[in-house]
Amino acid sequence: MNSGQLAEQHARTYLEQQGLTFVDANVRYPFGEIDLIMRQQDVWVFVEVKFRSSNQFGGALNALTSKQITRIRLAAEHYLQRQKLNPPCRFDVIAMNIDEINWLQGCF
């Protein structure tokens, strides 16, 4: 496993410990990717996982671009359409560094 895969596994475990239910991971389409799909009661949660081994370039929180946000949103819309679902949903970010994890809920 590479560091990104390890970070996604750690994020999944963390979210499950917070009471979320795992649905899917690494959902890829030509126009975007979703790292984790979780559920919190009836809300579907699309999670982008960002990991940085240091804060040299602003850390994990600064690693998400507007282009990436657009691609994640498109992928989530496509996923829901393919599954024929129309649930309430939100977009979260798990920002991880070597020694901390930050869960930002509903951040885009």
UniProtKB/Swiss-Prot annotation:
Superkingdom of the organism of origin: Bacteria
One Pfam family matching this protein: UPF0102
GO molecular function: nucleic acid binding
Family: Belongs to the UPF0102 family.
NCBIfam families: PRK12497.1-3, YraN family protein
Name of protein: UPF0102 protein Sfri_0388
Organism: Shewanella frigidimarina (strain NCIMB 400)
